[in-house]
Every structure is written in C-alpha cells, then in structure tokens.
Amino acid sequence: MCDKIFHNLSGKTLVATPYVITKGIYHKSLIYMLSHTEEGAIGLIFNRLVNHVDLKSFFKIKEDKITSQVMVPIYLGGPIEHEKGFFLHSRDYNKNLLLDFHNDLAVSSNLEISEDIAFGKGPKNSLFIVGYTAWKPGQLEEELEKNLWLVMDCSKEFIFAENPENKWHNALKHLGIDEIYFSSQIGNA
C-alpha cells in the first residue's frame, strides 16, 4: 500500500459537490479552510446566511461602549459550537488576529473587532460566522477521494460578494463546471 501525499488546504475553499448529502448544512456549501494538518482540519461555511444578529448582545458588549443595536448578517459556519463567533474579514484590519492568510484574508474572534465594526472602525469587508466545521485526521482526505468536495482558490471579492445564494453556482462556473454535469451522476431511488 502506498502512503498518501498530504496537501495542506489552509486558505483554500472547499466547494460541495452534489455527492454531499442533498439536504442539510453541507448541501451546496462553500467552506473556507482555516487549518488543515495531518491532525485534522477546521473550516467555516461562508454561504449559509441564517439571520441577523445584534453584535452588542452576542458579544455582551457593555452599554457604555455601544448604546444602540448593531445588526449584522450572521452565517452558519458549521455544526460545531454555535456559541462561538468568528469574523472572516479583509486584511485591512489587523488587530489581534486569530489567523492570518496570504490571500488578503484573516480571521478574528474577539470583543475588540466587534466593537470596532460597531463604531465603523473595523475591516472594510467581513462576515460574522457562528460555529465551525471540523474533520478528524484523514477524514477530509477520504471525503476528497470520494469526490464530495472540489478545491479552489478564491478571492476576497468572491467571499464577500453580496448574494450568498449564488456563491455556490458561481464557484462551479469559476471552476469551469456546469451543474448539469452532476445531474447524470445522481439517479432516482
């Protein structure tokens, strides 16, 4: 048996193929990979808009800091730890970064960025994402072998595009794939 070559996908985007369960959180999802090592992988789904949230309430910001509500769109990043909030944002904001990527993107998860966004001092572009997705060692590689995911580089312009409903279709177009290709691969029961 041959050893498998490990390719680090940190900073890449996973595009769900129709082989992923047709209902549920991963159907037509796009996942920005935060970390991918031989110990496992972590990512944030960035095209599942679920609601709007008041940053003041979510981060329990004191009244004297922010006096009014600051409503932002909230995205579901995955099925794990929905009480944790992350900002996937442009690199023009660089205070207390959790992760810094070489493609003009960063991740923060602290009170300071939420306050800065509330006061208009935050990053030019950001998505507020709750929860995350994780894989055990070898699990993501197995899913890639089963063609559950396509891998792509994507720009901050793509990630922060206005309409989250079109992002999956646009990702397929970017990869040169027509969704019709998959329709012949999936049959009826």
From Swiss-Prot:
<protein>
    <recommendedName>
        <fullName>UPF0301 protein RP032</fullName>
    </recommendedName>
</protein>
<dbReference type="GO" id="GO:0005829">
    <property type="term" value="C:cytosol"/>
</dbReference>
<comment type="similarity">
    <text>Belongs to the UPF0301 (AlgH) family.</text>
</comment>
<dbReference type="InterPro" id="IPR003774">
    <property type="entry name" value="AlgH-like"/>
</dbReference>
<dbReference type="Pfam" id="PF02622">
    <property type="entry name" value="DUF179"/>
</dbReference>
